[in-house]
């Protein structure tokens, strides 16, 4: 998260917690026409999977946070507030969240290049809270990344395990019709009748 997003997350987290929910993280996206402030919320880990986040939860958080933002005013200018569930491709914002999803695949964008790359995709192998690092397995190679160097990260869902992978066609591929080769290239094209 950016410094601005971190400050806003620290400001809003107690409000979200008071509603019995968890603030996973905040995205602050400035733009010339107005910024977007996106909050990702979820039910506390202890209540999962019995309870899931729903539209009513998002609406409650939106109302409360909106009122708080009007009073605190941490964003100058116009902005749009979005409150969302994390979804299956959930974003990851901190070491604790990476640790929760150890063994899963993630897509990561780095702030600064590491080994000549800013993007990597691999399995979350381990986290080291003391060192502030996350170890990924990328193309069968161990890659250690500082949590401070992560700009964005998202879980890469296992669509097959979720039962949502597209099925592969079986059998031979359908044959395409052959182009008509009976006409001679010297014959003039048929003329369309003109309306008069």
UniProtKB/Swiss-Prot annotation:
InterPro entries: Ribosome_maturation_RimP, RimP_C, RimP_C_sf, RimP_N, RimP_N_sf. Keywords: Cytoplasm, Ribosome biogenesis. It comes from the Bacteria. Coiled coil: none annotated. Disulfide bonds: none annotated. Transmembrane segments: none annotated. CDD domains: YlxS_C. The keyword Repressor does not apply. The keyword Cytoplasm applies. Required for maturation of 30S ribosomal subunits. Belongs to the RimP family. This is Ribosome maturation factor RimP. It comes from Stenotrophomonas maltophilia (strain K279a). The lineage of its organism: Bacteria, Pseudomonadati, Pseudomonadota, Gammaproteobacteria, Lysobacterales. The gene is rimP.
